[in-house]
Amino acid sequence: MERAYSPSEILKKKIPSIPFEGVWRDAFGEPGRTGVWLIWGESANGKSSFAMQLARELTKHGKVAYNSLEESLSLSFQNNMRRCRMEEARGRFLVLDREPIEALTERLKRQRSPDFVIIDSLQYTGMNYKEYKKLKEQFPNKLFVFVSHADGEKPKGSTAVSVQYDADMKILVQGY
């Protein structure tokens, strides 16, 4: 049988967080450093732009990997990086060009692997919910940020809908 905790034990526990400042703190407070976030929105509403700005902010708190499954290393991706001045985050930001989940898993097993992993997009991973859970549970000390397509105001597809229920932070992007 697993150990049970008292309320006082839980409240005394130091849970690592991201000490956002300014507009990021106003929007998200001080979220946990681990777990899952889901960003979703309709096409051309700014999901990737928002994700890149989030990546830039996260580089202040650790190492970030951005797996560009959907856009790859396209001109729009390059322009997005330029707008967010990602070159200033040298050493704390790396771009993965359509890295399969199996290769990403191997990368995350290494020492000094990224603290934060942005996957753009969930649909392009081809993962089902069981595979998503396996990835998340294999790396409990990482924060995964998945970008998802939308069907109206809901994430698109059964995996994305299930991830939405599981995610610690849920961000709908509209007209960003």
Where do the language-model regions lie?
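Phosphate-binding/switch loop-helix module in NTP-utilizing enzymes
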Residues: 95-147
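Charged, amphipathic alpha-helical linker segments immediately N-terminal to NTP-binding catalytic cores
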Residues: 1-14
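Pre-Walker A adenine-sensing motif
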Residues: 15-31
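Conserved P-loop
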Residues: 33-102
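Phosphate-binding/switch region of NTP-binding enzymes
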Residues: 137-176
